[in-house]
């Protein structure tokens, strides 16, 4: 492990928006705990909050952000807020869904993603066209996708969109490399967000990971986060404990050796922690 004191904690998207390189995810946060946990994450230094309509906590996330900014005299523009469209359907349903998200959040959206390509080509393209209009109005600052495979991305590019996707959020960790999608995104300047980067905690005691982390004198969680960062991804992590929030964010003052990054990358098993199926291969 080597120290890296000058590493940036943000990255610039293709549209010029600056996004923090680590996000705090609100997936499966209990409704009655979400406000406190998002507030705690902001107190811990997170400036990137990731929610979605299907999480059922957009209203709590939005209120926590607005309240925290007011209490701490922080500009709303200093916080990066992501939400997602639950389902691709038709143009008008997508517009209604976006208006609903904006209402629940009580603030503009920095990044809005199509959460799943499910629904078919016609629905995907119609949903994207609707999203673009909210970029024009300023209610959404950036648009992107989630769980898009290469064919879905190619389809979107072929539709001659007004705005190209800034981000593709997919499941990524050493046990699921998604090399074809990663390569396509990198070649088209699409930032890659990694969800389930800590494997939902399932592999934190993995016999392959534990000795590597021990040798580097870091936690397995920090090892996985550094792997994600050094691969060029933006990990979306979640924790309900303050000490874990802090340690998971304390990863910008060191790097792991390139050979360790390569070793971790060799662990690919096409194993999904977040789902029992591959959402990137739907028609």
Swiss-Prot record:
Which positions are catalytic residues? 55 (proton donor)
Give the top-rank taxon of the lineage listed in the UniProt record for this protein.
Eukaryota
Q: Where is this site: Lowers pKa of active site Tyr?
A: 84
Q: Which GO terms describe its cellular component?
A: cytoplasm; cytosol; nucleus
Q: What class of enzyme is it?
A: oxidoreductase
Q: Which GO terms describe its biological process?
A: arabinose catabolic process; D-xylose catabolic process
Q: Where in the cell is it found?
A: Cytoplasm; Nucleus
The record's EC number reads 1.-.-.-
**CDD domains, alphabetically?**
AKR_AKR1-5-like
Any Pfam family hit: Aldo_ket_red
Keyword line:
Cytoplasm, Nucleus, Oxidoreductase
For this protein, the record's InterPro entries field holds: AKR, Aldo/ket_reductase_CS, NADP_OxRdtase_dom, NADP_OxRdtase_dom_sf
Q: Which family does it belong to?
A: Belongs to the aldo/keto reductase family.
Full protein name: Uncharacterized oxidoreductase P32A8.02
């Amino acid at each position: 492990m080597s120290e890296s004191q000058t590493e940036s904690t943000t990255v610039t998207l293709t549209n010029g928006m600056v996004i923090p390189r680590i996000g705090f995810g609100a997936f499966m946060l209990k409704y009655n705990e979400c406000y406190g946990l998002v507030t705690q994450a902001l107190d811990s230094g997170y400036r990137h909050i990731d929610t979605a309509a299907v999480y059922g906590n957009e209203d709590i996330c939005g209120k926590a952000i607005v309240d925290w900014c007011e209490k701490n005299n922080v500009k709303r523009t200093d916080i990066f807020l992501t939400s997602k469209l639950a389902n691709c359907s038709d143009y008008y349903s997508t517009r209604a869904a976006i208006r609903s998200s904006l209402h629940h959040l009580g603030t503009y959206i920095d990044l809005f993603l199509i959460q799943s390509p499910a629904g078919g080509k016609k629905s995907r393209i119609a949903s994207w066209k609707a999203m673009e209009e909210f970029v024009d109005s300023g209610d959404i600052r950036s648009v992107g996708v989630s769980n898009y495979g290469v064919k879905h991305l190619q389809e979107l590019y072929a539709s001659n969109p007004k705005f190209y996707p800034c981000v593709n959020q997919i499941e990524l960790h050493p046990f699921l490399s998604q090399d074809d999608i990663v390569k396509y995104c990198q070649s088209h300047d699409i930032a890659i967000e990694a969800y389930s980067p800590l494997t939902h905690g399932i592999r934190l005691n993995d016999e392959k990971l534990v000795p590597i982390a021990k040798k580097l004198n870091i936690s397995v969680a920090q090892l996985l986060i550094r792997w994600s960062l050094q691969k060029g991804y933006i990990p979306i992590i979640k924790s309900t404990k303050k000490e874990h929030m802090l340690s998971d964010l304390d990863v910008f003052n060191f790097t792991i050796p390139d050979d360790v990054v390569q070793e971790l990358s060799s662990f690919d098993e096409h194993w999904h922690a977040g789902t029992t199926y591959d959402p990137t291969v739907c028609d």
